[in-house]
Amino acid sequence: MRTALTAFVGTTLALGLTAPATAEPSGGTAPSLPAFVPHPSDWSPNYTVFPYNLWQVRVTPEQVDAQRESCQWFNAQYGTLMSQIVGFQNFLGGQHDYWTAPGVQAAGDAVKANVDQSAAFLDPRAHTLYITNYPDQSQYSPLYNGDSIYHLWYQLTQISDKIAKQQPSGVINANIATANVYGNVIRDSGVCNGA
């Protein structure tokens, strides 16, 4: 009974925390995402939420640009990237996590290339948004959900690492689920609307 309950809870968590799109990779490989190029816009950060309204004086123009550009990437490519990641995870799981099965390595390489490209774009922006507070040395973002962008970037690096190490689909799922949580926070907060 205990084993059955544990399996049920684990399955429920795995199903409930993955990204919504689950299509298998077309032809076994994901198409390359175009290199994202940010553009000027009238977007501005949300300073109405406490404590970000108090931290507004700490925000630099570089942080505003970093969040605007991260949001533009999010609006343009996050959904497609997560669909590819989940599609690959399901494809790998359907092959019983055998990386030597036909098409698995090529599909993993294609998705990893897109994840790496996205993480490379977000890396300097995420680090600009997530700063160290003095004197207590805690880390935070003075912009609303800037920390979520940082955590999303980190999860993408971990997904790439797990694909590079040919981990089983269930191991990759932990980072996919966490990336999906941060993606939902960003999307549902509306912080990127109009970027």
List each language-model region with its residue ranges.
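Secretory targeting and sorting signals
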Residues: 1-25
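N-terminal low-complexity, Pro/Thr/Ser-rich intrinsically disordered segments
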Residues: 25-70
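Membrane-inserting hydrophobic helices used for pore formation or membrane fusion
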Residues: 144-159
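Polar/charged, Q/E/K-enriched amphipathic alpha-helical segments with strong coiled-coil propensity
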Residues: 157, 161-179
